[in-house]
C-alpha cells in the first residue's frame, strides 16, 4: 500500500505542476515585461526574456503531493505515525529545510525583479540567510535526537565526528545551495539532473529501510518531470534561484534527516561540478590574474566549446546519472 502512496504522490506532483505551469508561464511572462531593460541579466536576448520564478510551481505542487501521499501511507499503515524512528518528524524537518531554502531563493529572484540588484540578494545577506536555514534544520534534528554524528566512508566504515558534525553538515547545506544557484542558466539542466537525483534518492531510501520517506523524492520527481515540459530547451520557464535552492534543500536535507548526509555529495554531483568550477576559476584568477577555464560554470564552458542547449542538457544529465550510480554503489 505504501507503494501506492508513492505512485499517488508522483502522479499528483506531475499533475499539479503541469496545471500550475499552464497558469504561471504566461503570468510570469507578463511580469518579466515590466522589468526595466537595464536590469536584465547579461545573457542572450532569448534567455533574458525567460521568466525565472518557476520554482514556485515545484514548491507548491510538491508540498501538496507529499501531504496527500503521506496521508495515504499513514491510512494504509497507521504505525508510521508512532514509529520509533520518528518518520513523520524527519519528513517534516526535511520539508521545512527545503521550503526555507526555497524561500531564500524566492527573495533572491524578487530582488532581481523589484530593484536594480541585477544579481539578486547581496552575497553576505544571502549567505547569512542560508546559514540560518541550515542552523534551523540542524537544531530541529538535534532536539528530536535525529542528528547524525558521523558519516560512512568507503573502506573506513562509520567515522564519528563528534562536535564537528553539525559544523560540517551546515557547511555542506550552504555550499550545496550556492552551487545549485550557479547552475540556473542552461535550459533544463537543473530539473533534468535533479530528476535523476530524486529517482536515486527513492531507491536509496528503499534500500536503507526508509521506504515511507520516499514520498518526498517521489512527489518531487513527478513535479520535475512536468516542469521539464516548459524548461526543456528552448525553455519557456526557468526554476530561478527559488527552484535551484529548493532542490538543493531537498538534496541536502533528506539524506541528512535519514542519517546519511554523505549521500548529498554523489547525488548532487552536477551541482558540485558547476559550483566547484566557479570556485576554481575565482581562486586561480586571484592568484595568477588569468582565468583557468575558458568559461565557468560547467554549462557555460560547454557552450563556449560549441555545445548547443540540448547537448548541454544531455551532458549534465549524464553527469547526474553517474552521481546516481556512485550513490547506489556507495550503499551496497
What are these regions (language model features)?
Residues 2-272:
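"…together with the soluble PPM/PP2C metallo-phosphatase catalytic core" -> "…together
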Residues 22-23, 29-36, 270-315:
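Membrane-proximal soluble regions of multi-pass membrane proteins
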Residues 309-330:
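Final/C-terminal transmembrane alpha-helix of multipass membrane proteins
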Residues 54, 137, 251, 277, ...:
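Alpha-helix boundary/capping detector
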Residues 8-10, 283-284, 327-328:
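A short, structure-level motif marking secondary-structure boundaries and short turns
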Residues 198-202, 278, 324:
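Hydrophobic transmembrane alpha-helices of multi-pass small-molecule transporters
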Amino acid at each position: 500500500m505504501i507503494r501506492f502512496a508513492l505512485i499517488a504522490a508522483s502522479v499528483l506532483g506531475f499533475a499539479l505542476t503541469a496545471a500550475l505551469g499552464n497558469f504561471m508561464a504566461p503570468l510570469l511572462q507578463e511580469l518579466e515585461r515590466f522589468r526595466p531593460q537595464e536590469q536584465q541579466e547579461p545573457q542572450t536576448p532569448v534567455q533574458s526574456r525567460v521568466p525565472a520564478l518557476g520554482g514556485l510551481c515545484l514548491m507548491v505542487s510538491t508540498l501538496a503531493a507529499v501531504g496527500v501521499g503521506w496521508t495515504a501511507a499513514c491510512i494504509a499503515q497507521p504505525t508510521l505515525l508512532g514509529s520509533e524512528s520518528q518518520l513523520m518528524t524527519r519528513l517534516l524537518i526535511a520539508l521545512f529545510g527545503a521550503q526555507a531554502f526555497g524561500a531564500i531563493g524566492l527573495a533572491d529572484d524578487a530582488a532581481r525583479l523589484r530593484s536594480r540588484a541585477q544579481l539578486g540578494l547581496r552575497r553576505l545577506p544571502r549567505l547569512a540567510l542560508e546559514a540560518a536555514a541550515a542552523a534551523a534544520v540542524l537544531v530541529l534534528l538535534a532536539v528530536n535526537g535525529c542528528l547524525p554524528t558521523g558519516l560512512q566512508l568507503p573502506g573506513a566504515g562509520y567515522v564519528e565526528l563528534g562536535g564537528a558534525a553539525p559544523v560540517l553538515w551546515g557547511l555542506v547545506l550552504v555550499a550545496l545551495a550556492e552551487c545549485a544557484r550557479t547552475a540556473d542558466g542552461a535550459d533544463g539542466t537543473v530539473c533534468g539532473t535533479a530528476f535523476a537525483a530524486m529517482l536515486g534518492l527513492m531507491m536509496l531510501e528503499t534500500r536503507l529501510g526508509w521506504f515511507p520517506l520516499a514520498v518526498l523524492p517521489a512527489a518531487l520527481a513527478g513535479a520535475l518531470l512536468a516542469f521539464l515540459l516548459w524548461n526543456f530547451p528552448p525553455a519557456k520557464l526557468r526554476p530561478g534561484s527559488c527552484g535551484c535552492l529548493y532542490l538543493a534543500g531537498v538534496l541536502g536535507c533528506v539524506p541528512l534527516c535519514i542519517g546519511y548526509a554523505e549521500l548529498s555529495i554523489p547525488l548532487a554531483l552536477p551541482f558540485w561540478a558547476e559550483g566547484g568550477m566557479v570556485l576554481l576559476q575565482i581562486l586561480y584568477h586571484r592568484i595568477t590574474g588569468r582565468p583557468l577555464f575558458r568559461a565557468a560554470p560547467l554549462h557555460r564552458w560547454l557552450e563556449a566549446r560549441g555545445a548547443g542547449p540540448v547537448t548541454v542538457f544531455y551532458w549534465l544529465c549524464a553527469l547526474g546519472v553517474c552521481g546516481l550510480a556512485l550513490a547506489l554503489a556507495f550503499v551496497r
